């Protein structure tokens, strides 16, 4: 009976597969949004102010950061929780694949969130004259919370690795 339960629990990891497929659809939508932004920028590029162009490029950077985060979560999550990817050509295999454990994924996600929030905050500062001060303050506090959380998670990870090395 115990073996059946263990096999069932182990097989249930495949329930995550549709989640990763869904993330790949999300990545497709994000890619479409990226090109929509570019198509939106091109006709107005000569009339666009410098700050308008910077804001448009920040939007593209934001989409790229979220896309990179999605790829990292899809690949590393699939390899950590479902199955190793059988990529025959080692030259095409991404260098970090198979090397990220759950803690390193969490740290990368936290770092990505900090980077994404930085882009949003920079965009907010560039439009500061049209935004209420309390909204800017709230965004700064939220970003600081992200930064402190990322540092905290990295510190905990470092301490747990140090503890593991002592044993």
Swiss-Prot record:
GO CC list: plasma membrane
Transmembrane among keywords: yes
Subcellular location: Cell membrane
InterPro entries listed in its UniProt record: UPF0114, UPF0114_bac
Keyword Membrane found: yes
Annotated TM spans: 15-35, 53-73, 136-156
Location, primary (coarse class): membrane
Protein name, entry field: UPF0114 protein in repA1-repA2 intergenic region
